[in-house]
Regions:
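His/acidic metal-ligating clusters that form di-metal
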Residues: 127-145
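Structured beta-strand-rich core segments of catalytic domains in phosphoester-bond hydrolases
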Residues: 32, 37-115
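Catalytic metal-binding/acid-base residues of hydrolase active sites
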Residues: 7-9, 38-39, 78, 114-116, ...
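N-terminal, active-site-proximal structural segment of metallo-dependent hydrolase catalytic domains
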Residues: 1-53, 65-71, 239-249
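Metal-dependent phosphoester-hydrolase catalytic domains
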Residues: 84-85, 139, 150-249
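Active-site neighborhood of phospho(di)ester-bond hydrolases with catalytic His/Asp-centered motifs
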Residues: 33-36, 60-62, 143-147, 172-177, ...
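Active-site environment of divalent metal-dependent phosphoester hydrolases
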Residues: 10-13, 40-44, 66-68, 118-120, ...
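Active-site-proximal beta-strand elements of phosphoester/diester hydrolases
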Residues: 1-11, 100, 106-117, 145
Length: 249
């Protein structure tokens, strides 16, 4: 199964999508697409129709709380709203930027997430709640995926310790191929979009895709890009029975 998580950088606005967005999604051909730093609204009816046209017919969106960004999940397979909630946090940013779904046909669960740009005590409280939410799912076939605003491969980066701790506990937190997932206006690249998979699933490959067919998916040049974040593409292993597999089945 191919999973794609993409931060669209809407910054709490119902921004228009780049004309290159839909062709990119068509070429990426995900089985499940998660959009974060995204805002849903009346203008998105065409987006939902377009996603259906490329096979992503099943769509769920997190509730927008206090004007925060949201998460949209679109899938080739039926989705069922899950019960895991985002961490309680300042102005409900953690709750709004979080969506848990189930994919019954593949005995699989997915959480789209974006860590809000908190600081100080607000950031500490958010991460405490997020880690609690992740750890309570340790026995499930589940992936958390999106913009975590940290990099586990840079130990000195704020909150890297949390993703590193999950690795130590047996969660799969791969280091994706590619140089960066976010690029600043001054062209400084960082790797802050990640996947966290339970030990009951196996990730075959993870990568950041910054360009596709000559189109810039992510760039510091606003006029030419889809976003300032590259899509994170994750390939989950499947068993011979067509179900998502782990190392033990």
């Amino acid at each position: 199964m191919k999973l794609v998580a993409w931060n669209l950088g809407h910054q709490c606005r119902e921004d228009a999508l780049s004309h290159a967005f839909l062709p990119a999604v068509r070429t990426l051909a995900p089985d499940l697409l998660s959009l974060n730093e995204y805002v849903h609204g009346q203008s998105r009816a065409q987006l939902v129709a377009d996603l259906s046209d490329v096979g992503l017919k099943h769509v769920l969106v997190s509730e927008r709380l206090n004007g925060n960004n949201q998460v949209l999940i679109a899938s080739r397979y039926q989705l069922v709203q899950g019960e895991v909630l985002g961490p309680q946090s300042k102005n409900q940013g953690g709750e709004s930027n979080f969506l848990h779904v189930r994919v019954p046909s593949h005995n699989f669960e997915f959480v789209g997430v974006r860590a809000p740009a908190y600081a100080g005590e607000d950031l500490r409280v958010y991460w405490s709640g997020l880690m609690q939410a992740i750890r309570q799912c340790a026995g499930r076939r589940i992936v958390f995926m999106g913009d975590f605003n940290t990099d586990p491969d840079r130990p000195r980066r704020a909150n890297a310790k949390h993703l590193r701790a999950l690795r130590d506990e047996g969660w799969s937190v791969p280091s994706p191929e590619g140089e960066w997932s976010y690029i600043s206006p001054k062209s400084a690249g960082t790797r802050i979009d990640h996947a966290v998979a339970s030990m009951h699933l196996r990730i075959e490959r993870a990568e950041y895709i910054t360009s596709l067919g000559g189109v810039e998916l992510a760039s510091s040049r606003k006029a030419n890009r889809v976003s300032d974040h590259a899509p994170l593409v994750v390939h989950l292993a499947e068993s011979s029975r067509g179900k998502l597999g782990s190392d033990s089945n």
